[in-house]
């Protein structure tokens, strides 16, 4: 039985256009949007058994055909709309609406950052289907009238980058921009900033910078819709964690929507003994789900963690970050850690935008010393944070000196797979871009310059020698002065006065 959710997108749940007893094929239209939303299609051949307010139950036929019921759009944009394609990086914004814009020669920015630790399915897609991915990018460019497209991808992915470089000569208006291996380089405004050098305010859309940002898997589904008239009912996903087949990430391509988390975990070998939780998504922004939760168009990762550590009721302060878990997630983790939630603060750069926290400058932190001092003054012994690579680094600049034990929301996930916890920033926030030949085409780095260490996510290790001098961590005194926590007053012939705020 497949449970196909009616809300797999930003907006309202779609309205069912089938009824119990109807026979459906793979690709059959099950529901249409009412207002903002996207079409929902069956991922299997079968019989509609039940319709609820939020989902449709389809009983699978014993025999499944290889084909599908095609869509009937007449141009690129209508095919994307009919296919029900949404942003497949997790946000789920309807793609036809996003691309229904005249950029007047602007940029299509393709997000291939895959910035959450452990997730591997975007890179597998590039390795297996580079040409089709690039064709999807070209179709998206035509839809939004972009003059150029830029694929934003982490520099560490050498094999994928070199494969794209070999394929790009057939697509002269598409280029690559290399990203550092830090979180959250895949955040929409971070992509705009890194590629175009424009920092948008938290309330702005990429269109204000003359750009549209689209996920790399979304581009693949666009190519399928245009070339094969194929609806969107499949999802690429990564499964990792406490599994019998090992802790390494396993990639599953073209998983039918409605497949349960439990079914996909079974395909990955099953859970190895007791576990803490199962996450949908990545270690930073994932949400806890059950084995019966169905896969949707936005389900990028399934992570099975080891059991939670026991903080034995420790007084814990929670630092909410726009780049990580929201308040509900952090409260849930406090309970699972057996911690006493004592104080809550938001990251210095987090601003409220229509009820959602947004970062003023994703991945660049001015310092968190004031927040840490607040926790100390409230009697906390521990702090739980969900911050990005840079913010976590600034927390570590002051919390240990105040005898506060730091826990990151990703700790139990990363420990499960043997990765180092997020603590100190050890890699530069800038990376060298690809060289260009005499014809103006990007080419691979010379071999002796190709190897780069990995950082970001949970792979960061404390190694101060890898940072440029200008990027070294501020001293506690510098951080406290910068945040206005105390002032030093020096007058000729007088004692030095330190005034605490």
Region annotations inferred by a language model:
Residues 108-122, 350-355:
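Gly-rich Lys/Arg/Thr-decorated short loops/hinges at beta-loop-alpha junctions or inter-strand turns
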Residues 129-143:
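Histidine-anchored nucleotide/phosphate-binding helix
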């Amino acid at each position: 039985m497949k449970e196909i959710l009616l809300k797999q997108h930003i907006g309202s749940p779609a309205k069912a256009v089938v009824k119990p007893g109807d026979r459906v094929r793979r690709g059959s239209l099950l529901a249409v949007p009412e207002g903002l939303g996207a079409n929902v299609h069956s991922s299997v051949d079968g019989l509609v058994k039940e319709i609820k307010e939020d989902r449709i139950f389809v009983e699978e036929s014993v025999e499944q055909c290889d084909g599908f019921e095609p869509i009937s759009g007449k141009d690129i944009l209508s095919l994307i709309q009919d296919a029900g394609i949404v942003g497949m990086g997790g946000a789920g914004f309807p793609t036809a609406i996003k691309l229904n814009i005249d950029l007047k020669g602007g940029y299509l920015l393709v997000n291939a950052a895959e910035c959450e630790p452990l997730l591997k399915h975007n890179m597998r897609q590039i390795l297996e289907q580079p040409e089709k991915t690039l064709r999807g990018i070209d179709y998206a460019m035509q839809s939004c009238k972009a003059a150029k497209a830029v694929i934003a991808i982490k520099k560490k992915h050498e094999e994928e980058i070199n494969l794209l470089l070999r394929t790009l000569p057939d697509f002269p208006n598409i280029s690559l921009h290399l990203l550092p291996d830090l979180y959250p380089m895949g955040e929409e405004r971070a992509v705009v900033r890194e590629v175009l050098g424009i920092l948008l305010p938290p309330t702005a859309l990429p269109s204000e910078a003359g750009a549209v940002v689209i996920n790399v898997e979304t581009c693949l589904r666009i190519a399928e819709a245009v070339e094969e008239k194929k609806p969107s009912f499949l999802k690429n996903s990564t499964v990792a964690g406490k599994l019998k087949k090992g802790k390494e990430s396993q990639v599953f391509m073209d998983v039918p929507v409605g497949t349960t988390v439990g079914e996909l975990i079974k395909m990955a070998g099953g859970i190895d003994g007791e576990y803490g939780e199962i996450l949908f998504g990545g270690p930073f922004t994932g949400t806890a789900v059950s084995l019966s939760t169905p896969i949707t168009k936005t389900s990028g990762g399934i992570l099975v963690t080891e059991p939670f550590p026991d903080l034995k009721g420790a007084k814990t302060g929670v630092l909410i970050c726009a780049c990580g878990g929201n308040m509900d997630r952090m409260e849930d983790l406090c309970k699972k850690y057996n911690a006493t939630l004592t104080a809550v603060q938001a990251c210095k750069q987090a601003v409220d935008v229509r009820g959602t926290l947004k970062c003023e400058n994703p991945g660049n932190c001015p310092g968190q010393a004031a927040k840490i001092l607040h926790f100390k003054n409230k009697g906390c012994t521990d702090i739980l944070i969900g911050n990005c690579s840079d913010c976590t680094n600034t927390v570590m600049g002051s919390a240990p000196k105040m005898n506060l034990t730091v826990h990151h929301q990703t700790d139990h996930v990363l420990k499960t797979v043997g990765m180092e916890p997020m603590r100190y920033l050890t890699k530069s926030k800038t990376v060298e871009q690809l060289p260009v030949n005499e014809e103006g085409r990007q080419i691979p780095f010379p071999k002796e310059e190709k190897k780069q260490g990995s950082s970001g996510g949970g792979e960061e290790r404390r190694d101060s020698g890898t940072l440029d001098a200008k990027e070294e961590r501020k001293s506690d005194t510098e951080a406290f002065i910068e945040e206005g926590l105390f002032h030093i007053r020096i007058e000729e012939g007088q004692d030095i006065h330190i005034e605490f705020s």
